[in-house]
Amino acid sequence: MLVGVVVIAVIGVLFYWNSYLLGSRGDDPFTRGPYVVGLTSTAAEVRFLGPDPAKVTLTALAPNGTSVVAKGGKFVGLESGQRYLWTATVDGMGQASGSFLTAPTDPQAAVTFGVIGDYGAGNAHEYAIGRGLAAIDPSFVLTCGDNSYLLALPALYDRNIFTPLHDVMAEAPLIVDLGDHDTFLSAGGKGIADAVASPGDGITYTYEYGPVQVVVLGVESSAAEVAYAKAAFAKPWNGPRFIVTHKALKPGDPLLAVIKGKVDAAFAGHLHRYERRMVDGVLNITVGNSGEGPGNPEFTKQTPEAVYSTMDYGFVRVIAGPAGTKIQMIDEAGALRDSVTVPPR
């Protein structure tokens, strides 16, 4: 009898504790994000979907204790090279937070960024990649295309992009190259580019973050992309420089002659592998292993000129600085699988 009373009393205490003392975390009012876009040395933007924007206040806190309130989601008047903590409140209650590192103005500053490709599957592997990316605290994340499978339908953006990469996108903008799965429907690629605020037309553009420059060329090196690259590389750039196409460059590709000696590396995806290759004197890094998976082995064969090749899931960390550029492939379990250091140009 006494044991029964004690059991009932304990259950009652636990019920009261869980219901009234612990309280409820409540539902997340944001259906997308918040996530960072448009990051420069003095400005940043945080976007979201869900609550009425009139009820949301975005505040960025600098290391020195000063704060800036966003207008229309945009922070201006920021200090360069500083990590800001941002908080989103809804009706005065903090509901989301993150941070971003404004671009440095020091040409000798080192910049860390991530690279992924063929990732937009919304599966457990992509979530693992997203967690790994967040752990390296990148300034931005470059994608090598195929951001959404099988098509870049707006209804799939959250499943394939914004939810798996939620944590890293709360601190680093996604610099998107479009792949053939993204552009199969023309509106799909444009929708992704608009959502992440890609510069220009969202297909061919140049992104600059401090001393780092990335030239984004879309699916492959057609005549229009080669012409864009010639114009871009005709302009001097003293810092680390990169190029990205969705489909990897092959020996004899006319783009290789344009970029030889002018880039630290050329990134690509499409092949669902990670590969490191030297092609006509240019370091090529294929990052097609970030979520979708290898598929049919018949169509996922190692490239003949590959120095290193694997179908294991992973992402790339790039540390670019005045002493050179270190490019590392990290697998979904957090192990370093490949590393190469590129001396300054």
Go through the PLM ranges and name each one.
Residues 35, 67, 85-101, 154-240, ...:
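Extended active-site neighborhood of metal-dependent phosphoesterases/phosphodiesterases
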Residues 110-183:
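Conserved, compact domain cores that house catalytic/ligand-binding motifs in diverse enzymes
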Residues 115-120, 145-148, 180-181, 219-220, ...:
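Active-site metal-binding loops of divalent metal-dependent hydrolases
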